[in-house]
Amino acid sequence: MNMRPDTCSVLVLLLMLRRNNGDSVTQTEGLVTLTEGLPVMLNCTYQSTYSPFLFWYVQHLNEAPKLLFKSFTDNKRPEHQGFHATLHKSSSSFHLQKSSAQLSDSALYYCALSNAGAKLTFGGGTRLTVRP
């Protein structure tokens, strides 16, 4: 196959942009184990070229992942099932917190970001195990 040099350059550029769009999500803890009643904090930091939308998903054993939170503006603090998450654009963080862990909170938690409807970029996930 014989391509013109400008066509090759465009293809290489497109492949580079597709491979590295500048978005990443980091969940520093892969496994968190704590006693029922203690506070929970699951860390999520991100890097993004644009101003992203952030999400937390929860996946209980033998169930599909479910959306737990979405955040579109700075310093909003929605609450769901006792959990809350605050988006801090200044520190590029969207940590998930709960004042008192329950046994039913044991699950896999994923932080994710999206830029204006583009694909979701997920963190590695954090498995929370709550013991009596």
From Swiss-Prot:
Disulfide bonds join 44-111. SMART domains: IG. One of its GO terms (cellular component) is T cell receptor complex. Residues 115-132 are annotated as: J segment. It holds the Pfam family V-set. InterPro entries: Ig-like_dom (IPR007110), Ig-like_dom_sf (IPR036179), Ig-like_fold (IPR013783), Ig_sub (IPR003599), Ig_V-set (IPR013106), TCR_variable_region (IPR051287). SUPFAM superfamilies: Immunoglobulin (SSF48726). One of its GO terms (biological process) is adaptive immune response. The keyword tRNA processing does not apply. Keywords: Adaptive immunity, Disulfide bond, Glycoprotein, Immunity, Immunoglobulin domain, Receptor, Signal, T cell receptor. Residues 23-114 are annotated as: V segment. Residues 1-22 form the signal peptide. CDD domains: IgV_TCR_alpha. Glycans are attached at residue 43. This is T-cell receptor alpha chain V region CTL-F3. It comes from Mus musculus.
